[in-house]
Amino acid sequence: MAGNAAVGVLALQGDVSEHISAFESAIQNLGLNIPVVPVRKAEQILDLMALAIPGGESTTIMRLIEKNGMRNIIQNFKGGIFATCAGMVVSARDLINETRFTPLDLLDITVNRNAFGRQRESFEADLQISGFDTPFHAIFIRAPVITRAGPDVTILAEIPQGIVAAKKGKKLILSFHPEISHDLRMHEYFLKDMLG
């Protein structure tokens, strides 16, 4: 574990308050005492045990990561990474049909940023997630999918269009928005996996 055992939520754009609330509830459910903090400055990342990269608009998030001098710090961060939707996009090694920015290469994955096109911008699905006893009701909003995962990446859930949940070590990458689903299992899974 790195630094001062806090979970940070990248607070540049996206579902920041929803992730903070979900992590606080998950931490309480697990009987842990870990603070959850918004992260707006690069130096804050150094003191974290985990960093959440929330959904939002991937081009904007990446531009703000660059502007705030966070790229190298996030790429070299040894704690956990919890990335959702646009967070998945910026965490990828490669992107399909996206040349406006270079992603962070946190996992050996290729991501299709607009996998469902404009006609299916938002939908919900009950996912069978590896290790979960019952389906997880996932909310997808203009969601990306993983089209290729490297051999060191564990696939946790798929739909016909591609992979929607994957992990490598302490990094958990999701296409959907668990922070708005009222089901804390993804946040709890991440915390338990990271602390285990």
Swiss-Prot record:
What Gene3D superfamilies does the database record attribute to this sequence?
3.40.50.880
Q: Which reaction does it catalyse?
A: aldehydo-D-ribose 5-phosphate + D-glyceraldehyde 3-phosphate + L-glutamine = pyridoxal 5'-phosphate + L-glutamate + phosphate + 3 H2O + H(+); L-glutamine + H2O = L-glutamate + NH4(+)
TM spans (from-to): none
Catalytic activity, EC: 4.3.3.6, 3.5.1.2
Q: What keywords were assigned to this record?
A: Glutamine amidotransferase, Hydrolase, Lyase, Pyridoxal phosphate
One of the record's GO molecular function terms = glutaminase activity
For binding L-glutamine, which residues are annotated in this chain's numbering? G56, E57, S58, R113, I141, R142
This protein's record includes keyword Hydrolase: yes
Instruction: Name a GO CC annotation attached to this entry.
Output: cytosol
* InterPro entries associated with the record: Class_I_gatase-like (IPR029062), PdxT/SNO (IPR002161), PdxT/SNO_CS (IPR021196)
GO BP: glutamine catabolic process; pyridoxal phosphate biosynthetic process; pyridoxine metabolic process
Q: In which pathway does it act?
A: Cofactor biosynthesis; pyridoxal 5'-phosphate biosynthesis
Summarize subunit and interaction data from the UniProt record for this chain: In the presence of PdxS, forms a dodecamer of heterodimers. Only shows activity in the heterodimer.
Protein task: Catalyzes the hydrolysis of glutamine to glutamate and ammonia as part of the biosynthesis of pyridoxal 5'-phosphate. The resulting ammonia molecule is channeled to the active site of PdxS.
- Please give the name of this protein: Pyridoxal 5'-phosphate synthase subunit PdxT
Identify the species of origin.
Methanospirillum hungatei JF-1 (strain ATCC 27890 / DSM 864 / NBRC 100397 / JF-1)
- Gene name of the encoded protein: pdxT
